[in-house]
């Protein structure tokens, strides 16, 4: 039973890391898209 808390924390860390990575990629893509639009104007 001592394994479950560490596993829970591990999964929470993985999830938060994935969310942070996803947000970072979304921001980078948005910035590049905005840059393209501004250059085409």
Curated annotation (Swiss-Prot):
Matches recorded under Gene3D superfamilies: Single helix bin (1.20.5.510)
Main location: membrane
Spans within the Cytoplasmic topological domain: 30-41
Ranges that cross the membrane: 7-29
Entry-linked Pfam families: PsbX
Family to which this protein belongs: Belongs to the PsbX family. Type 1 subfamily.
HAMAP family named among the record's database cross-references: PSII_PsbX_1
Subunit text: PSII is composed of 1 copy each of membrane proteins PsbA, PsbB, PsbC, PsbD, PsbE, PsbF, PsbH, PsbI, PsbJ, PsbK, PsbL, PsbM, PsbT, PsbX, PsbY, PsbZ, Psb30/Ycf12, peripheral proteins PsbO, CyanoQ (PsbQ), PsbU, PsbV and a large number of cofactors. It forms dimeric complexes. Part of a photosystem II (PSII) assembly intermediate complex PSII-I; crystallized from a strain deleted of psbJ, it forms monomeric PSII before addition of the oxygen evolving complex. PSII-I includes 3 assembly factors not found in mature PSII (Psb27, Psb28 and Psb34).
Protein name, UniProt field: Photosystem II reaction center protein X
Gene label: psbX
